[in-house]
Amino acid sequence: MNNIFSKLRDFVGLNEQVEYEYYEEEPETDNNYQNLYQQENPQPPAPQESATAQNRRWREPVPTMGDDIAAGSKPMGNVIGMPGAINGISEVLVLEPRTFEEMPQAIQALRERKSVVLNLTIMDPDQAQRAVDFVAGGTYALDGHQERIGESIFLFTPSCVQVSTQGGVLHEVPQPPARPSRPTGSPNQTWGNETNRMAQ
């Protein structure tokens, strides 16, 4: 039995000796270190210059986030706007593709938060099925939704769009869950009740 495991380890390569290569560096003398340090780092500025710079920093008002918003200045650099949400206008793209090669346009539109109506009446039925499968997969990957509207006509929407009919809502936009309120009782009392239930 041990023989089988050793053969398996040999096959996988776990029994191989690991060879480490060591390089020995010559110890540097204190002179070389000091010379190297002085060449790399210039001398600090004169004390008077740094004192005036500190005074300038002390006297200048520091803008706060509220000041930036109130002044209507540019938002922080790490905030990225959502395409299509600039004016609150939603866009619907109607595609009537002739070939499968036009399908990445539909996926790109979904990535830009646009709804896509795909009319596949012009396409060959096999190509149309392939196109629907492709766009449906992309829609699923983007947490979007799909709905068949008619014969060879499909609606693909991003996750931020609510789809409804006269009979009711087919898909609602998920709302963030509300946090449950915490009990006002003491935590020790609740813990004690749980241990009593467990002991019984």
Swiss-Prot record:
Coiled coil: none
GO BP annotations, alphabetical order: division septum assembly; FtsZ-dependent cytokinesis
Biased composition (Polar residues): 183-200
Any one GO CC term of the record: cytoplasm
Major localization class: cytoplasm
InterPro entries, sorted: Cell_div_SepF (IPR023052), Cell_div_SepF/SepF-rel (IPR007561), SepF-like_sf (IPR038594)
Keyword Cell cycle appears in the UniProt entry: yes
Subcellular locations according to the entry: Cytoplasm
Keywords, comma-separated and alphabetical: Cell cycle, Cell division, Cytoplasm, Septation
One Pfam family hit: SepF
Region annotation (Disordered) ranges: 35-60, 170-200
Biological role: Cell division protein that is part of the divisome complex and is recruited early to the Z-ring. Probably stimulates Z-ring formation, perhaps through the cross-linking of FtsZ protofilaments. Its function overlaps with FtsA.
Subunit structure: Homodimer. Interacts with FtsZ.
HAMAP family recorded: SepF (MF_01197)
Family statement: Belongs to the SepF family.
Protein name (database record): Cell division protein SepF
Species assigned in the record: Nostoc punctiforme (strain ATCC 29133 / PCC 73102)
Gene of this entry: sepF
